[in-house]
Amino acid sequence: MDIKQTAVAGSLESSDLMITVSPNDEKTITITLDSSVEKQFGNHIRQLIHQTLVNLKVTAAKVEAVDKGALDCTIQARTIAAVHRAAGVDQYDWKEIDSWNV
């Protein structure tokens, strides 16, 4: 998926995550994370966001995530929503997304 504009999903409420996805001219994926649970789960959150981007076939994006203790399913859902908004895609391929769950 090609990121065309900046988009945001989520909130700064407890147990949520606010994620901002923007185009990246460097043609790489960069993830910046601000989390209250950085020491315990920072690497896991980054890996989950990165894997979700890979599953969506995103090859270049700047991602800024502010985590307030979100569960994995919330992190994944917010990432999916932000990427679709940033790519200008209105339709979700639910079969493809569901196939990620093994």
From Swiss-Prot:
Keyword line: Cytoplasm, Phosphoprotein
InterPro entries with a match to the protein in the record: CitD, Mal_deCO2ase/Cit_lyase_ACP
Main location, first listed in the record: cytoplasm
UniProt gene name: citD
Coiled coil segments of this chain: none
Organism (species): Streptococcus pyogenes serotype M4 (strain MGAS10750)
Subunit architecture: Oligomer with a subunit composition of (alpha,beta,gamma)6.
HAMAP family: CitD
Family to which the UniProt record says this protein belongs: Belongs to the CitD family.
Protein name in the entry: Citrate lyase acyl carrier protein
A Pfam family of this chain: ACP
Signal sequence extent: none
Function according to Swiss-Prot or TrEMBL: Covalent carrier of the coenzyme of citrate lyase.
Intracellular or extracellular location(s): Cytoplasm
Keyword Cytoplasm: yes
Modified residues (O-(phosphoribosyl dephospho-coenzyme A)serine): S14
This protein's record includes keyword Endoplasmic reticulum: no
Entry's Gene Ontology cellular component terms: cytoplasm
